[in-house]
Amino acid sequence: MMIWQCKMRDWLILAFLAAACFCTIVRGQVAPPTRLRYNVISHDSIQISWKAPRGKFGGYKLLVAPASGGKTNQMNLQNTATKAIIQGLLPEQNYTVQLIAYYKDKESKPAQGQFRIKDLEKRKDPTKPKVKVVDKGNGSKPTSPEEVKFFCETPAIADIVILVDGSWSIGRFNFRLVRNFLENLVTAFNVGSEKTRIGLAQYSGDPRIEWHLNAFNTKDEVIDAVRSLPYKGGNTLTGLALNFIFENSFKPEAGSRSGVSKIGILITDGKSQDDIIPPSRNLRESGVELFAIGVKNADLSELQEIASEPDSTHVYNVAEFDLMHTVVESLTRTVCSRVEEQDKEIKASALATIGPPTELITSEVTARSFMVNWTQSPGKVEKYRVVYYPTRGGKPEEVVVDGSVSSTVLKNLMSSTEYQIAVFAVSAHTASEGLRGAETTLALPMASDLELYDVTENSMRVRWDAVPGATGYLILYAPLTEGLAGDEKEMKIGETHTDIELSGLFPNTEYTVTVYAMFGEEASDPATGQETTLPLTPPRNLRISNVGSNSARLTWDPASGKISGYRIVYTSADGTEINEVEVDPITTFPLKGLTPLTEYSIAIFSIYEEGQSLPLVGEFTTEEVPAQQYLEIDEVKTDSFRVTWHPLSAEEGQHKLMWIPVYGGKTQEVDLKEEQDSYVIEGLDPGTEYEVSLLAVLDDGSESEVVTAVGTTLDDFWTEAPTAIEPTSPVTSVLQTGIRNLVVDDETATSLRVSWDISDSNVEQFRVTYLKAQGDPMEEVVGTVMVPGVQNSLLLKALLPDTEYKVTVTPVYTVGEGVSVSAPGKTLPSSGPQNLRVSEEWYNRVRITWDPPSGPVKGYRIVYKPVSVPGQTLETFVGADINTIVMTNLLSGMDYNVKIFASQASGFSDALTGLVQTLFLGVTDLQANQVEMTSLCARWQIHRHATAYRIVLESLQDTQAQESTVGGGVNRHCFYGLQPDSEYKISVYTKLQELEGPSVSIMQKTQSLPTEPPTFPPTIPPAKEVCKAAKADLVFMVDGSWSIGDDNFNKIINFLYSTVGALDKIGADGTQVAMVQFTDDPRTEFKLDSYKTKETLLDAIRHISYKGGNTKTGKAIKHVRDTLFTSDSGTRRGIPKVIVVITDGRSQDDVNKISREMQADGFNIFAIGVADADYSELVQIGSKPSSRHVFFVDDFDAFKKIEDELITFVCETASATCPMVHKDGVDLAGFKMMEMFGLVEKDFSAVEGVSMEPGTFNLFPCYQIHKDALVSQPTKYLHPEGLPSDYTMSFLFRILPDTPQEPFALWEILNKNSEPLVGIILDNGGKTLTYFNYDYTGDFQTVTFEGPDIRKMFYGSFHKLHVVVSKTLAKVVVDCKEVGQKAINASANITSDGVEVLGRMVRSRGPNGNSAPFQLQMFDIVCSTSWASKDRCCELPGLRDEESCPDLPRSCSCSETNEVALGPAGPPGGPGLRGPKGQQGEQGPKGPEGPRGETGPAGPQGPPGPQGPSGLSIQGMPGMPGDKGDKGDAGLPGPQGVPGGVGSPGRDGSPGQRGFPGKDGSSGPPGPPGPIGIPGAPGVPGITGSMGPQGALGPPGVPGAKGERGERGDLQSQAMVRAVARQVCEQLIQSHMARYTAILNQIPSQSSSIRTIQGPPGEPGRPGSPGTPGEQGPPGTPGFPGNAGVPGTPGERGLTGVKGEKGNPGIGTQGPRGPPGPAGPSGESRPGSPGPPGSPGPRGPPGHLGVPGPQGPSGQPGYCDPSSCSAYGVGVSHPDQPEFTPVQDEQEAMDLWSAGI
């Protein structure tokens, strides 16, 4: 019954209940469930079912408890549930069950019952029962599995990660069975967040996490996730998936717990397509116990490799998916048992306490690190945890090391900081107490030996010694001048730079420069220096003209540089006049208003934007103003007289006339016109003597000298004679004095004040006279001054300093003079400048400073002159406010006397004198060495500031001189071509920018001539300029055949002598030279490392003797390659290899092949032909272009004509940063990096961590760089001269599935500290490409490229990458398509003291870091930025253009008819000169007495066609026999014919080239045919298997197991699909793909896709790029028929046949034809990769008739891989491409083929 709880106010619901319910329903109750039933389904599980109650209810509460008492477990169920499974029960125990329905807060009466599980094995303590809910009807949850047999009741918990194979081979139906299996698996465990956790990952081509361990909290949630697990689809890359869960699932962030058992369960149905051993080993070693469950096609041996031991309990394998349920109970029991055992082990180890380590010791303390050592703890320690933090506070850091380690280095610390340290011993579940201590780091090291040099007007350089460990440097620099002190600048640079330029400085300014070494964000103590910039350039060549009495004209030459004008300062010599004017940028200027007869000093300054220059100085004296030569007084009267003079010229000005009574009075004056010559002075006093003065006043205000005359007016009593004499009274004479208290005081150096008291008011005037007291008493008066009678003081001026004067004052009355009064006075001594100081000494300047005098000054005059050498006395003037000056243009290392005068009102003061000295700009320790008869060398100690040296060699016999200039860093120079026994003077001048110091000289005499003259001229040819930087391994090959003769051979030797003499440095640091003389057999005259000096080398050349014989040039070239260019003979890595061949005739052996090989290997060959030499042969021998490498002279006397050009070309080749290499048929400048890293067939086996694999087309070799191979080479071997400024890096590479997601450097150059300098970084996780380097300023720069074209490089296919670097940009070209370019600065060159590395992980540190695995097929550096635009990507199948690309090696073409296409007929072979190149054929028979003929045309019977993959023969029509023709190009594959008749016998071939090594395939007899495998995505051709024993042709086998479904490939056009199918794959589809029909017919017409025969699917990419090799499947149906070849066992992609014997073409007659080889066994259904050439088999099918030619030997079988005929393309994955479904039978495929698909 249902009881409903209703609210009283809810009348609508009450009404509904009243109408719908039985009358027995009681309001407020919920009806209980009924019909409770029990069903035991396993030994610990029971199913409970019931009938739902009537009415409305919200859900159920199910309570289960042991009847004997114990914990009651309650579960809430949904209202749709009608069943529940209770798990984890114990047998032989009664349980009570209560089931209650509830609605909101009301519950029904419980439906109750009891049950007991009998006859089951005894169990452990009861645990919480688990309930499995089963919905009724159409509930949202599916029903549970019918049977649950086991439940893990252990209290131990675990972290279980299940890894599920979701590849295409499983199928959607089978994947449902996998879900059921997973549900049973999860059900068996007690799952919860605090119990056992279960995570799951699904994988195919790429793994993904479906849910982490901590994703769900209950078992129900986990089961729900299992039921909704999506099917992924893809490839089977189990190794990648195992590594994925190792890196992502068993981590704390993913829910993994410490101290908890870790279980990994793998479920897969096939063999992995990648390596599973390393990732499974990593998981096991990390403590994960692995279980492997294989289904259907799983590889048991692989499962055993993955799982933990023992295999009997950890490996499960079932035949079909519907049998997986049979292993659930066994698996869960084993896992449960192992979890319990591990839990005990974990707890036991946790109980064992660990004592702390002891004896903490710190050592090796630096500023950023120190080492911590301790004594190990007793007991089993898994690891040590070292915790450290700054004492003053900071975040604790820690380092964890292995338990076997007892020390570690703490890095990246702060300098000068105390750190607290604690070391803990850690076991699996416990840790010890900490061992504690402290240590203080040192201060950061600072820069040392700071030096400022190369100083200019606005720049200087600063350098210092590098600081170990510094991450960079901070440079601060600022002027010391007071007004500029705030203009401080800073510069940050990288740690590799210790020499930089500071620019933008002020001229003539002292700067302080401070350098800090930076360690991250920390800075060291500063290193500081001071230096003064040079002054600006002054004007030149001052000329002074038109000097007059008051004017002059200045003219000068302009200053260099951009100026804004000039400042002119002119000063009188006495310092009383200082004038200044600024003018525009003119070169002449008039000076006016000068004082006549005055000496002037001139200073002209250039005015720049930065300031003004030093002055250009000069001096001159103005002329005297003409004085008046005549002045006369007449017409004298009592009150007037006339003054007469000669008038001035009109242009000089006017006259000034002045007069004054001689005995005192007022001076009067009058200005008169210049033409006036007399004037009457009136108003004079009678009987008075007057002084009259006349001077000329010039127009500019200056005055001439004064002309003076004295005249006396008549007394008035003389006007007329008295008529009578009147008597007079007697007169008494009285001496009068009107002066008292005469005082002389207020003394200065040039003045005295005289004062007195007036005692008589009748005094008319006072006469003051003064004279020197020390002089003769009769000495004339120095001066007389008349003052009025009312004045009682006077200031006497212009006196001499420090002089005693006698001053006399006399009163003057009307009637005469009174009594004079005298007093002494003395002037003070003059005060001049004091305390001369010298600073800023430099090579051509010095600064002087002085203290000014106490008194006022007008300026200063500085006079200086060299002491020890005759020279002009120099002087300059400065203003009164200046007390320092820089004396410039001085001589280096010279003493100067300096005098400084102060200009004062009275003249110049006494001189302040001193001695100053400039620095010496000159070398030291100059000495001669290596003195020979005709040469000598000088060496010296380098001057620290020198920018260059000028070396002069003077002969004392004939005064001839040689002069050279070398750089400032050079300390040695040699002179050649000197006279023996002659005295020479060697002078070295040191230069600093434009400044040159004095010479330092020594005398040296060359050695005397030997007693007997040498056979050859003794003069060693001087090195040519073009050869100064030459560095090469140079071999001369000299023809010594009979046709040369003794005389001509000596001419060759003389030519070699001159040529070698042009080289500069001989030996390991320069050019090494070897010599070979060749005839029938080559003879090595000396090896590359035989001589270390030019003298000994030339002497050896002189003594080469003539050999005689025949001309075997080819043999000699091979001898040079194999014998001389070896490490034993001194050849060096990374150095250009140059050969010079000299011959006079045609070679009697083949030169073409060996020459081509050596050119392709990077040798630079010069060929010189004389007389009868064959020019076409010379062209074959010489490198390209022939215009630079091939020379021809008419006779042996004409070598001089080519000598200079040959030397130039050879030295340019030897000096080039980029050597010439042979690439794609042309010679160009660059580096063949594959050879330099040893990644070539002959060398790769010696490189650790590298294997050779098939590359593109399955024909080119590529090299797999395995994980942590860290392939490297020293930079000095690869790029000894660094990288050019512009270059292109070309790579052909492939990213592998196990290439890590972290960034790694595809290639990079490291310095000696393992710091990257330049390189390319690929980020597999971020799908980006980054190029980095240091620019010319020392700054680190990076540019990153991304986008679709970049991302596709990471999808697992081969891609061609060009990175173009120029001075302005970096450009990236992918698969011959430009994808982007970015601006960069010009690159700095690299250091050669580091290494170059392939694949280095970016996070790696130090020389032993990690590297990423990838495949590399090609790597070149071309010294050009245009190479990328010329490349046609011929190595990539999808981009290859057959018309423009060269033929593939050992390849077959794909044509529409599959028939051999004949090329055009070549000319018939025979004796004669070599003709034009014909079709690639065998050499014709040897002609009589002549050189080898050219290859002939193809014969009617073609050679055996290229070898196809091994398979069952499909008989064709018999071929007709014919004569053997020359070897032609490999023809297109035709249908297999029946064996033809026996052809003419041919020669045995030489051994063929070995094929690529591959994985071992399981060999065995061919099995019966099975169903064809499902087509896979286009992938890399598989690796060639090892050669197996010859097997007989087996019968068709029974159908084999179905292969895995491949990834979807890229879309191709319908036209391409049909064309490729018709042309190539007709017979393949007819014989092997008969089962493809029904599904393929469902493919839309416009989105068809080509799939190759089953191969390992690659990452989404363009279809043509190869994927990783697939494992060998079971034997399949007959493969595509190939021509009869040598038998081989079926292996990966077609095993190679027995190695054939193919040799170099001989010149003898053709040998007999070899017997046909045995037939090959049938192969598997997949096309094989090309194997090595087999020996000649039976005659192949008939080809097209060719032009009859001579019988040729059997051709070398080639390879024809049908997969290479598939439509390769470049592309990315297409998510919208329709999914392929496996073809079920052959009829479907036949139907599809007939439909034209």
Swiss-Prot record:
Post-translational modifications reported in the UniProt record: Lysines at the third position of the tripeptide repeating unit (G-X-Y) are hydroxylated in all cases and bind carbohydrates. Prolines at the third position of the tripeptide repeating unit (G-X-Y) are hydroxylated in some or all of the chains.
Gene3D superfamilies: 2.60.120.200, Immunoglobulins, von Willebrand factor, type A domain
Compositional bias annotation for Low complexity: 1474-1486, 1574-1584, 1742-1758
Biased composition (Pro residues): 1729-1741
Stretch list, region Triple-helical region 2 (COL1): 1655-1780
Biased composition (Basic and acidic residues): 124-135
Residue ranges constituting the Collagen-like domain according to the UniProt record: 1463-1511, 1515-1571, 1572-1610, 1655-1706, 1708-1758
Domain Fibronectin type-III positions: 32-122, 356-445, 446-537, 538-625, 627-716, 738-830, 832-922, 923-1014
Region (Nonhelical region (NC4)): 1218-1459
Signal peptide: 1-28
Renumbered residue ranges of the record's region Disordered: 124-145, 1463-1611, 1645-1797
Region (Triple-helical region 1 (COL2)): 1460-1611
Compartments, as annotated in UniProt: Secreted, Extracellular space, Extracellular matrix
Record GO biological process: cell adhesion; collagen fibril organization; homeostasis of number of cells within a tissue; regulation of cell growth involved in cardiac muscle cell development; ventricular cardiac muscle tissue development
SMART domains per UniProt: FN3, TSPN, VWA
Glycosylation sites: N94, N138, N373, N1385, N1389
Ranges where the VWFA domain occurs: 159-331, 1033-1206
Taxonomy of the source species: Eukaryota, Metazoa, Chordata, Craniata, Vertebrata
Role noted for this protein: Plays an adhesive role by integrating collagen bundles. It is probably associated with the surface of interstitial collagen fibrils via COL1. The COL2 domain may then serve as a rigid arm which sticks out from the fibril and protrudes the large N-terminal globular domain into the extracellular space, where it might interact with other matrix molecules or cell surface receptors.
InterPro entries, sorted: Collagen (IPR008160), ConA-like_dom_sf (IPR013320), ECM_Assembly_Org (IPR050525), FN3_dom (IPR003961), FN3_sf (IPR036116), Ig-like_fold (IPR013783), TSPN-like_N (IPR048287), VWF_A (IPR002035)
Source organism, top-level taxon: Eukaryota
Ranges of biased composition (kind: Gly residues): 1537-1546
The name this protein goes by in its record: Collagen alpha-1(XIV) chain
Assembly and oligomerization: Homotrimer.
Keyword Nucleotide-binding: no
Keyword set, alphabetical order: Cell adhesion, Collagen, Disulfide bond, Extracellular matrix, Glycoprotein, Hydroxylation, Repeat, Secreted, Signal
Position of sequence motif Cell attachment site: 1608-1610
Organism field: Mus musculus (Mouse)
